[in-house]
Amino acid sequence: MVLRLLLSEARRIRRCGRPRGRLPDRFFFVGLASLVWFLLRTGAKPSRIAYPCQRAALANASLWLALYVLPLAGVLRPGRRTLALLLAALALVGSLALLGLQRRAPAEGLQLEIRGRAASQQPSSSIFVVTGARGRYEDVRALIELMGEHGLKFYRSSRVSPVSGPDGLIARDDVVIIKVNSQWNERGGTNTDLVKALIMAILEHPDGFVGEIVIADNGQAQYGSYGRGGSLSWDRNNAEDITQSMEKVAQQFAAQGYKVSTYLWDEITLKRVREYSEGDLEDGYVVYERPDPYTGVIVSYPKFRTKYGTYVSFKLGVWDPRTGAYNSSRLKVINVPVLKTHAIYGVTACVKHYMGVVSDRLTNHNPHNSVGRGGMGTVMAETRYPVLNIVDAIWINPHPRGGPATPYSEAVRVNVIAASTDPVALDYWAAKYILMQAASRLGYRDLSSMDPDNTQAGSFGYWLRLSAEALRRAGYFVAVDESRMSVYVRPSG
């Protein structure tokens, strides 16, 4: 059938002759370049076809084959004619297959079955889940209260309450980095409503918050929705009001006198610097000299001056140029990834999210290549471990290997947020009970790419365990065994 359609199109092109104007001449080179680029960039990893740039290149290449290769079928000898037809058919089938890969969810979203459970072995990690969440303040407040009910206080304060105490997470004068996903627009980035609600909660510190909040990420100045990396000022965002960017959120609070700002580390990702203690006050990336012996990752991390003049080393803490000393305890990271499948690594959530901390380009793409060897676990351990991880699963991408790009048309609303101090346990649980459940509801049968119990080499479950090993070597307790996970669930409101 496809071959008959292609033959019909070839005859039509020959009848019509060459179109007027210079567009066909230009498109000959554009289409040919797209085909070459597609083959080089996709290489031996077909999963990369899910990336937006690959999809666009494949569409151009398909049209090029139909316009310039298929018409030759009528004048070539039988053997070469068959080859031309096969090439064109293959390209068209590939394009049609991409269009049919995604299964649509109901407009109202999916109602997942989320259950609590108690760990049967100790030590264990706690996971806190709020259902019916849409990124509102009451959703984050419900999460903080649920955490407090089970011993994890959000606010560090001498005032003891259900949500605060001396062992709480966030002190009144902390510098808090909210690490978001900025590389993709639409539903591929962290929900800006959720980030706004989280900032509101931080500012409600019982002792009065006098610290600073920085919304930050490194989209690597490459790939992403437009091939240029990340943005904190997208015009199409993951929010109820899609014009609400991370930058707009920060500006809303700054206009009220709060020290809230953004920093897109893409802007410094190509600049190698030394630490403040070595006399270098420039913004940029500190890069390790040697790769990690276990995971092979070359660790790097940002150091930068915030909008309000605070010097921050992601690894060493807040730098005081007057005393020449770092205050590590004042710097807190809250890791807020959006939950998605990933074309190469199966799932992207808390651990994979630290790809937005390192500089991929200063190290010849070493960090991204190391993810499958547990490299992001090493980065977490070597730089700064998040005090809290919050998975944004309000809108998700559950299509197997469909992410990380997530257009509005492919996102699925499930209205869940979940938090834990253990990024590995949270990734395991979110993949198994949110992504896999949603994918199954949509009719997908092969869920192996997102299954945390799949430990075949190269799989998500495999590299998640390697990441866990890297964190354990550094002294962190993380769980990848469900018997060591307690899950607490409550509805929002």
Task: Describe each region flagged by the PLM.
Residues M1-P19:
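Short, Lys/Arg-rich, polar N-terminal cytosolic tail immediately upstream
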Residues C16-L23, R55-L58, A430:
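Membrane-interfacial loop-to-transmembrane-helix junctions in polytopic alpha-helical membrane proteins
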Residues P24-V36:
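Alpha-helical transmembrane segments
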Residues F27-V30, A66, A84-L90:
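Small-residue packing motifs within transmembrane alpha-helices
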Residues L35-L72:
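Membrane-embedded alpha-helical segments of integral membrane proteins
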Residues L70-T82:
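Transmembrane alpha-helical segments in integral membrane proteins
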Residues G79-R103:
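Internal/C-terminal transmembrane anchor helices
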Residues A97-G493:
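N-terminal and secondary-structure boundary signal
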